[in-house]
């Protein structure tokens, strides 16, 4: 029954429900549900048990496949769209972000490798060099497969040798016709093409954005240049007004790049110095604006731009006169247009003269009629009753009752201007329209023109060409008269023609056409001329500079430099070489000979005094030895007179001894001086001296001649003394015969010595600084003048020196003098036991005899005999705080440790560097 009821139609069910609805007056009573217990019973527990059958249904066991799997094929239907037509495709460029791994990959510069074989041909950008050279090398190496991939144009195959491939015939270049435009005119085509694309782009954007083209963002900066020029003009005019803005940069000081002592001084710019360049005006003419599709449109009134501010308007009015003076080249750029250089040019200019007073006397009807015709011509182009023409846009009408005197005047003047190069042709048109109702007959009449150079013109060549035959212009017809100009010669040419009409228009006033042409010379040698002018200008500048410099040098007269005395640089070594040309000078050996000479001369003098014997001796030449053996003073030797110098220079044959090899012309002068010394110190002069004078003179010194030394030794009376002297003399001569080879200086020793000196200097400076900082008393120094041998020591002067003025050189000198004085004391004690040490000490003493010696206050114990000043004793007795002294010593110890640490590090670094260099270089050897 339920199934039967379910199959009944929906309308029947609705009717039954409506019929049963009134039979249910009360809703059924809801029974309360019985409480359900949460405790599971035994049946429920058994029902929850898991059976194996249920598990097998859920998890089907997978058996291993013993045979091959059955192939199951399925068919799918795929819907493919038809490709669109290629002509309707639109390509868009989409920018995608770069691959992040692209930057990490190293660039491959190994070349194309095998990419040639995969492609059909090799492109020029795939190789370095030209394709011709690449193919030639490939063919030479026998790689024909690679050579086939190179496709070269036939005109470039001529570079390949004839043995490899036959030479193809290169096509002949076709000559361009003379009337063809030059290739430089292609930029006009590109300009027009780009302008067309720009116009299309503007139209699309303006339609899409619903904005005019002038308000687009791409055209928003058209007026920015004008605003910048106006700002610059106002900024230049503001310094003239006293409104707190002036050219502060003009009065500002110069800037430094870095420090004022070691930096660079920055010069001012031209603008800061007042040298301002004129304002350059850049605009777009009206023709260019129309060509680019930018009509001149004014901004809306509600746009409050910079140039519309009230402050700017008042500022313009206040600076109007000054801006006009500063920027006086304001031109109407809207009317300018670039025609081109050397391009034929033509223009038409119409001039309508003012009405004369005589024409005003004509009837009022004619005047009213003429005005009405003019107004009609300006408003609506409608035909005019009677004869009338539009001559180049100007109305020329028939006037009744014309005055015969008006025929002398010009009614309408037309000027046609031509400009072209010589030999080229240009043209211009003249338009005449018959806007009346009457046919007008016309003819051309050439007007006479006054020529001021008739004698110079030999032939009259025609240069203007046009159709000058008469004709008729029908009503409503338009005539175009084309005028051509061509001239073989450069110059300015002019012709005047009159356009005659019948009936006569404008009361007989002439319709004049003036042809004005300019023919320019083509400058063929412009580049060569400019190059020549630049060379001449440079040559002129160099010539002028040289002439000015020569004039200045001639005007400057510098006095000649006083020649230094030729004998000012004679040293002991030079005298020794002159006396003994075959021997080599050694300072130690020569000093030993000096001591030996002094020793034997003193012994001989004592013997002579004891015996009172007068025996004839060999005359000797004695030369006073200067305090410093390294040089001889000019006062020791007599100066040569000018005439004697000239004689010695002119006659070099007067030299007594042969010259030594390698001696220059200066040695000639030295030898002549030595000859003078020989003459003045000769035996005759010694004999002329009186005995009293000889007694008062000090003992003679050795004249550095070994032969004289030997002769003097031979005069000794005792044979033992003579033999001993000869042995020592022969020993010294043997040493002097050997040439002394100087060794290379020890670089490491010198550098370490310099570092040690720097450490000592820095230590002394730190000590002085600590003393001044802690308030300790200043130390004293004593200056001592050490006299020469045989002289009495002058009194010692003790001077107090402040720590700030104590220099490094004084401290070094004090330390060195300490060593010399101690060595000298030891020498006096030892005597002649150690001759080698005496030689070294004597050499040191000879180098520093004339210098002042500085000794510390600790050396005053040796000078107790002298009277010290009172101030020194007072300062030495001042009490010193032990705490301050302890602090001073601690600080000084720390400084010493730091300085010594740095010294050791520097020495190690230098030793390592020099050691690495010595490993590469050769070992030290004697200089040959």
UniProtKB/Swiss-Prot annotation:
One of its GO terms (molecular function) is phospholipid binding. Keywords: Cytoplasm, Developmental protein, Differentiation, Membrane, Phosphoprotein, Spermatogenesis. Residues 1-38, 164-183, 786-881 are annotated as: Disordered. InterPro entries: Ig-like_fold, MYCBPAP. The modification Phosphoserine is found at residues 557, 564. Residues 164-177, 806-865 have a biased composition (Basic and acidic residues). This is MYCBP-associated protein. It comes from Rattus norvegicus (Rat). The gene is Mycbpap.
């Amino acid at each position: 029954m339920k199934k039967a009821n379910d199959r009944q139609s929906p309308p029947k069910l609705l009717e039954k429900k409506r019929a049963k609805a009134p039979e249910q007056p009360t809703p059924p009573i809801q029974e309360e549900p019985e409480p359900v217990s949460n405790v599971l019973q035994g049946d429920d527990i058994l029902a929850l048990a898991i059976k194996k059958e249920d598990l097998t249904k859920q998890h089907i066991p997978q058996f291993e496949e013993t045979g091959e799997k059955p192939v199951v094929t399925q068919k799918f239907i795929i819907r493919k769209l038809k490709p669109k037509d290629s002509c309707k495709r639109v390509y868009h460029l989409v920018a995608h972000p770069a691959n992040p791994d692209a930057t990490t990959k190293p660039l491959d510069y190994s070349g194309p490798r095998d990419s040639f074989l995969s492609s059909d041909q090799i492109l020029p950008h795939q190789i370095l060099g030209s394709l011709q050279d690449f193919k030639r090398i490939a063919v030479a190496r026998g790689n024909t497969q690679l050579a086939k991939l190179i496709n070269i144009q036939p005109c470039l195959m001529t570079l390949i040798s004839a043995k490899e491939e036959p030479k193809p015939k290169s096509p002949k270049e076709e000559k361009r016709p003379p009337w063809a435009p030059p290739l430089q005119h292609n930029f006009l085509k590109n300009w027009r093409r780009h302008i067309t694309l720009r116009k299309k782009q503007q139209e699309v954007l303006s339609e899409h954005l619903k904005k005019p083209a002038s308000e687009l963002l791409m055209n928003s900066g058209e007026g920015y240049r004008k605003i910048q020029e106006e700002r610059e003009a106002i900024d230049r005019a503001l310094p003239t007004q006293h409104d707190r803005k002036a050219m502060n940069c003009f009065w500002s000081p110069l800037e430094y790049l870095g420090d004022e002592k070691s930096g660079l001084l920055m010069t001012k710019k031209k603008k800061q110095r007042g040298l301002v360049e004129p304002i350059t005006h850049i605009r777009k003419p009206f023709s260019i604006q129309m060509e680019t599709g930018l009509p001149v449109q004014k901004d809306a009134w509600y746009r409050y731009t910079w140039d519309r501010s009230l402050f700017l308007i008042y500022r313009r009015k206040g600076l109007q006169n000054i801006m006009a003076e500063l920027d006086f080249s304001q031109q109407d750029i809207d009317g300018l247009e670039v025609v081109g250089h050397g391009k034929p040019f033509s223009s038409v200019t119409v001039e309508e003269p003012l009405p004369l007073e005589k024409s005003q006397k004509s009837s009022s009807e004619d005047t009213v009629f003429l005005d009405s015709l003019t107004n009609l011509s300006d408003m609506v182009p409608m035909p005019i009753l009677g004869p009338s023409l539009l001559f180049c846009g100007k109305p020329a009408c028939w006037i009744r009752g014309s005055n015969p005197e008006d025929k002398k005047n010009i009614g309408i003047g037309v000027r046609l201007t031509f400009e072209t190069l010589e030999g080229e042709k240009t043209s211009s048109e003249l338009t005449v329209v018959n806007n009346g109702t009457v046919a007008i007959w016309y003819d051309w009449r050439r007007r006479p023109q006054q020529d001021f150079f008739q004698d110079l013109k030999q032939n009259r060549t025609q240069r203007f060409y046009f159709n000058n035959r008469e004709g008729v212009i029908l009503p409503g017809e338009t005539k175009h008269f084309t005028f051509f100009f061509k001239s073989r010669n450069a110059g300015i040419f002019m012709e005047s023609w009159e356009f005659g009409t019948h009936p006569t228009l404008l009361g007989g006033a002439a319709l004049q056409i003036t042809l004005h042409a300019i023919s320019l010379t083509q400058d063929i040698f412009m580049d060569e001329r400019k190059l020549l002018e630049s060379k001449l200008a440079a040559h002129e500048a160099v010539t002028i500079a040289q002439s000015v410099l020569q004039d200045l040098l001639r005007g400057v007269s510098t006095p000649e430099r006083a020649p230094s005395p030729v004998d000012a640089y004679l040293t002991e070594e030079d005298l020794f070489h002159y006396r003994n040309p075959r021997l080599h000078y050694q300072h130690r050996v020569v000093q030993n000979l000096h001591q030996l000479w002094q020793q034997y001369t003193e012994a001989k003098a004592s013997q002579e005094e004891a015996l009172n014997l007068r025996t004839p001796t060999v005359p000797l030449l004695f030369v006073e030895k200067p305090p410093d053996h390294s040089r001889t003073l000019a006062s020791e030797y007599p100066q040569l007179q000018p005439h004697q110098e000239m004689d010695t220079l002119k006659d070099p044959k007067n030299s007594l001894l042969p010259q030594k090899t390698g001696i220059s012309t200066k040695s000639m002068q030295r030898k002549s001086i030595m000859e003078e010394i020989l003459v003045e110190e000769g035996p005759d002069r010694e004999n002329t001296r009186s005995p009293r004078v000889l007694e008062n003179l000090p003992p003679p010194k050795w004249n550095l001649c070994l032969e004289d030394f030997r002769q003097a030794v031979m005069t000794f009376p005792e044979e033992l003394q003579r033999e001993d002297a000869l042995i020592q003399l022969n020993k010294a001569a043997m040493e002097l015969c050997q040439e002394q080879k100087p060794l290379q200086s020890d670089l490491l020793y010198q550098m370490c010595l310099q570092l040690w000196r720097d450490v000592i200097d820095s230590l002394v400076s730190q000590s002085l600084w600590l003393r001044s900082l802690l308030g300790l008393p200043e130390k004293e120094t004593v200056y001592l003048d050490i006299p020469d041998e045989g002289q009495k020591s002058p009194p010692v002067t003790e001077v107090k020196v402040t720590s700030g003025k104590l220099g490094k050189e004084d401290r070094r000198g004090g330390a060195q003098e300490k060593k010399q004085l101690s060595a000298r004391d030891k020498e006096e004690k030892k005597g002649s036991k150690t001759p080698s040490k005496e030689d070294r000490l004597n050499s040191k003493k000879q180098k520093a005899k004339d210098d002042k010696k500085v000794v510390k206050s600790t050396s005053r114990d040796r000078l107790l005999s002298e009277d010290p000043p009172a101030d020194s004793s007072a300062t030495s007795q001042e009490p010193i705080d032990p705490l301050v002294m302890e602090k001073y010593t601690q600080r000084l110890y720390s400084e010493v440790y730091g300085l010594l640490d740095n010294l050791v590090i520097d020495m190690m670094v230098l030793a390592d560097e020099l050691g690495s260099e010595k490993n590469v270089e050769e070992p030290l050897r004697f200089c040959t």
